[in-house]
């Protein structure tokens, strides 16, 4: 999906014009992928706009940086305030927010410690991510495995990890699928190229544990919280790929994907091919909270002030 530019980007504590947010070609991140990032959504609401689970996202950015021995020069509160600042200055909501911390221009070589750390935060309009919409996506099991836990840390949302995601997504696209599902090194279900995955079987909601090379998704955690609140039985356990074929319902979760039903896997229909009752129940609660149509019972929303907000469209 093409990027729609806004006016300002936050860089190292200052708002600068969008077109000036450039980096040098010899920056460490360009050569070695030394970055960590986040994806966050700001939702339009009847009374304005709000960022969904902002502190949790920015804490994960800090955690990802720590795993890669990057000490960010900003506190959690400062980073959260910067997100609000850039949204309110650009006046764009709903929107997608992309904070990124990277090793900049300084030294060449694999050891990154001599290169400075730069932090950017951008926001821009962005719609649905997974093709298929409310009717469900046609996806496949990828021939590419997710990264082994002793090679790349899955708990870090690092730019370099997404080279693996690109292989999964491109393979799916070439073969006519909306998305691919990666297995871990033991052949168990891990996640999509950029989404966590859930399956429903006989009324029980299953999702792979983080030990299956899955990212600790904020939306994943939100869905687990919602499901337990709704009284749904939830099990975090390893899932063989064939369970996805015989599941009653399967759906993706993620900041970009939100809650996205899956219609078929490897051209095998999931259930009757339509979004199932539990998927709808969870999605209704998720979007209801995010769009301000239901109470913020879990304290997930950070209000922002913008002059114009697009109407809520769930």
Name what the model sees in each region.
Residues 1-85, 107-314:
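Helix-start/capping segments and mature chain N-termini
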Residues 94-96, 177-178:
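Short secondary-structure junction motifs
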